[in-house]
Amino acid sequence: MSIKINHELPIPEVLKNEYPLSNEQKSIKQQRDKEIRRIFTGESDKFVVLVGPCSADNEDTVCEYVNRLKKVSDKVSDKLMIIPRVYTNKPRTTGDGYKGMLHQPDPDKAPDLLAGIIAIRKMHIRVLQETGLSSADEMLYPENRSYLDDILSYEAIGARSVENQQHRLTASGMDIPVGMKNPTSGDLSVMLNSVIAAQHPHHFIYRGCDVETSGNPLAHTILRGGVDKYGQTIPNYHYEDLIRLYDLYSKKDLQNPAVIVDVNHSNSGKQYKEQIRIVSEVLHSRNYNPDVRKLVKGVMIESYLLEGRQDISDHMTPGCSITDPCLGWEDTERLLYDIAEKC
């Protein structure tokens, strides 16, 4: 075989016992989960802001970022539900490049999956411990979510994974909101089919076990733009796109219709400064049409301590993205206050 086994990894229960949540942390997360659930069921009119670096590459800088986020969150908590975006595993278009802290706890060193699963659990716990903000991550590898399923308050399934059956079936067993992104083609039917699958019960194999799920009523959509056959970006955050999605939802028998608008990726063409303008347009659309307001539950923003991006090297600047370019902190802080004022 062409697969070499380096070593076995500890099962999730072992890692959870070694790096447990305290009773206080469990209580904080439980309360946050209730508040977030109420937003997606329509019982609360707070606006969700999923915000953070493209990739969580360093525990100290990520925690510094989320501590700053906490100060803003405390001031706008009557309007916004801020969920730190702490993404620890990254899909790569060609399979090459930095794949996240799960693979490389130190971007300068060789991949180490054992160190990686420990590092990402410790970082998510530290974020919760220091700030009281439970975080979001991407479910890139369905079987790996069991290492974090007691910590996360939100998960996203990316554009390259959304058609995969194991992702859809695993999402059906989650008890937190899970966002299904439109695929890179921009096909909204694929995204909605994923939501249908995730909201229904299933019977399948998971981590070597025969399992059944009850369906996830909080599964919803994420608009992130697409790319056409010529490689040109196709944004889908405009008013007419939101109306189209509303109409498509109306034709489906789905619980809790909702969308999060990802204002980077193909919606911005990775022009990170455009995120500010796109957020403003989304909020304008919400305020213009009550149906759009009810549907659009929040936005997703890529932001870090410093703006832009950098290549991995021996002299990297802490707090600057090593994957996609991000907004810097000053712009992020202003944007969050602006969202709270307009939403």
Language-model features and meaning:
Residues 11-20, 213-230, 316, 320:
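Gly-rich Lys/Arg/Thr-decorated short loops/hinges at beta-loop-alpha junctions or inter-strand turns
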Residues 52, 261, 328:
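Conserved, mostly hydrophobic/aromatic
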Residues 66, 79-244, 265-266, 270, ...:
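Active-site-facing alpha/beta catalytic cores
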Residues 1-41:
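N- or domain-start disorder-to-order transition segments that initiate the globular core
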Residues 25-42, 72-83, 89, 120:
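N-terminal beta-rich core of secreted/periplasmic extracellular enzymes
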Residues 304-343:
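Internal helix-turn-beta structural module
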Residues 48-61, 324:
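Conserved phosphate/anionic-ligand binding catalytic regions in large, soluble enzymes, centered on
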Residues 40-43, 70-77, 125-130, 213, ...:
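Acidic (Asp/Glu)-rich catalytic clusters
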